[in-house]
UniProtKB/Swiss-Prot annotation:
GO terms for biological process: L-leucine biosynthetic process. [4Fe-4S] cluster binds at residues 347, 407, 410. It is an enzyme of class 4 (lyase). It comes from the Bacteria. CDD domains: IPMI. Pathway: Amino-acid biosynthesis; L-leucine biosynthesis; L-leucine from 3-methyl-2-oxobutanoate: step 2/4. It comes from Acidiphilium cryptum (strain JF-5). The keyword Transport does not apply. Keywords: 4Fe-4S, Amino-acid biosynthesis, Branched-chain amino acid biosynthesis, Iron, Iron-sulfur, Leucine biosynthesis, Lyase, Metal-binding. Binds 1 [4Fe-4S] cluster per subunit. GO terms for molecular function: 3-isopropylmalate dehydratase activity; 4 iron, 4 sulfur cluster binding; metal ion binding. Catalyzes the isomerization between 2-isopropylmalate and 3-isopropylmalate, via the formation of 2-isopropylmaleate. This is 3-isopropylmalate dehydratase large subunit. The gene is leuC. Its cofactor is [4Fe-4S] cluster.
Length: 466
């Protein structure tokens, strides 16, 4: 029977099946950070267990680490405790760790592919929603809870029920000014934040194949915002060339044998999907969110919708609450809406390719006087490369803050926060109430739109910044 990519990876990792369909699934890679691991390690300690495969586990601190003045340490006591606890646990259990002082340190979902830890055909888990990022490698990657983190540490397996298959085909060619972020925002706007519930999304089509690995990671990263369990893209020559030479990747003949296998990781002709969605990339324009859910997407040329036109009372009330929180009016144009801050970073858009796009827009220009703008590279290696290419100086000359690697303003767990009422054009993945700080207002955008908005001081169409 014809199989999907998800079916193939799943079948290759099932250790055992239970009568109700639950599978014991083998896990190839376990990524660990400071937020969801403390109780998991403590559970091992109390049960007298060891980490079953330290060689398949790697840890890094990213959520709580400051992105400036690291010599001063972490000021917030709870954040400092989480990082210190992670360091104690990895030392006690022998888990490989990339410390904050390491040149490779960064966001776990950036360094996994960057180091060649994440590879095609693998099952990859982490106690973090955006583990779906690694699906860009052609891997089955998904977030897990703290109790599951403990289970994987102890057994290298998980109890999982198989998901449904969903295909999102993105045909056509992306127009100038549009990017992978616009693709995934448009998808979420089309199917909603519950559209992928119970499914693993496979992204395919001409526009997906044309994306570089950074773009593919952006798309897979936000699969969870569509409600999906995971998102993945079949590996191809773009993937293989990206993997080649990575520190943890196979070398020489071992790599060539691996590539021969990875070439089989594609959905068979005639494979059946439970749901199929088609998007025309050529019709896209740069996207921006207006509300407090990633599905509240409109083109930058569009307007805030009017709740009065919504027939469902519950949805209408939700829209009214969003507009009140975001301080927007029905019918208001998004383009030209004044902003206070710009954040270029996060596991969605902090790779060197993202920074090149943003730097290309701000080169020779200045950040608007009332805007606080920052660029936070996804890893120390991205930071070093951006500095070597002169991108960091472009940002500094324009008036951006240039920071150390970390999750930063994506979430309010470190010093990088919005003040109440501040409006931010952000390349991150979530725009919930208070996500970037209590009372902060977040508009999800691409790196190009974030850069353009920093210069104009308002939400801007990057196509007009040539």
């Amino acid at each position: 029977m014809a199989s999907t990519l998800f079916d193939k990876i799943w079948a290759a990792h099932v250790v055992d099946r239970m009568p109700d369909g639950t599978a014991v699934l083998y896990i190839d890679r376990h990524l660990v950070h400071e937020v969801t691991s403390p109780q998991a390690f403590e559970g091992l300690r109390m049960a007298g267990r060891k980490v079953r495969r330290v060689d398949a586990t790697i840890a890094v601190a990213d959520h709580n680490v400051p992105t400036e003045d690291r010599a001063a340490g972490i000021a917030e006591p709870e954040s400092a405790l989480q990082v210190a606890t992670l360091e104690q646990n990895v030392a006690a259990f022998g888990v490989p760790y990339i410390p904050v002082t390491d040149a490779r340190q960064g966001i776990v979902h950036v360094i996994g592919p960057e180091q060649g830890i994440s590879l095609p055909g693998m099952t990859i888990v982490c106690g973090d929603s955006h583990t779906s990022t690694h699906g860009a490698m052609g891997a089955l990657a998904f977030g897990i809870g703290t109790s599951e983190v403990e289970h994987v540490l102890a057994t290298q397996t998980l109890l999982q029920k198989p998901a449904k298959n969903m295909l999102v085909r993105v045909d056509g060619t992306l127009p100038p000014g549009c990017s992978a972020k616009d693709i995934v925002l448009a998808i979420i706007g089309e199917i909603g934040t519950a559209g992928g519930t119970g499914h693993v999304i496979e992204y395919a089509g001409e526009a997906i194949r044309a994306l570089d690995m950074a773009g593919r990671m952006t798309v897979c990263n936000m699969s969870i915002e569509a409600g999906a369990r995971a998102g993945l893209i079949a590996p191809d020559e773009t993937t293989f060339e990206y993997v080649r030479g990575r520190p943890y990747a196979p070398k020489g003949e071992a790599l060539e044998r691996a590539i021969d296998y990875w070439k089989t990781l594609a959905s068979d002709e005639g494979a059946q999907y439970d749901r199929v969605v088609t998007i025309d990339a050529s019709a896209l324009v740069p996207q921006v969110t207006w509300g407090t859910s990633p599905e509240t997407v409109v083109p930058i040329t569009g307007h805030v919708p009017d709740p009065a036109a919504e027939p469902d009372a519950g949805r209408r009330a939700q829209m009214e609450r969003m507009l009140q929180y975001m301080d927007l009016a029905p019918g208001q144009a998004l383009k030209g809406t004044k902003i206070d801050a710009v954040f270029i970073g996060s596991c969605t858009n902090s790779r060197i390719e993202d920074l090149r796009v943003a730097a290309g827009i701000v080169r020779g220009k200045k950040v608007a006087g009332h805007v606080r703008a920052m660029v936070v590279p996804g890893s120390g290696l991205v930071k070093a490369q951006a500095e070597a290419e002169g991108l960091a100086q472009v940002f500094l000359d324009a008036g951006f803050e240039w920071r150390e690697a970390g999750c930063s303003m994506c979430l309010g767990m470190n010093p990088d926060k919005l003040k109440p009422g501040e409006r931010c054009a952000s390349t991150s993945n979530r725009n919930f109430e208070g996500r970037q700080g209590p009372g902060g207002r977040t508009h999800l955008v691409s790196p190009a739109m974030a850069a353009a908005s920093a210069i104009t001081g308002a939400l801007a169409d990057p196509r007009e910044m040539a």
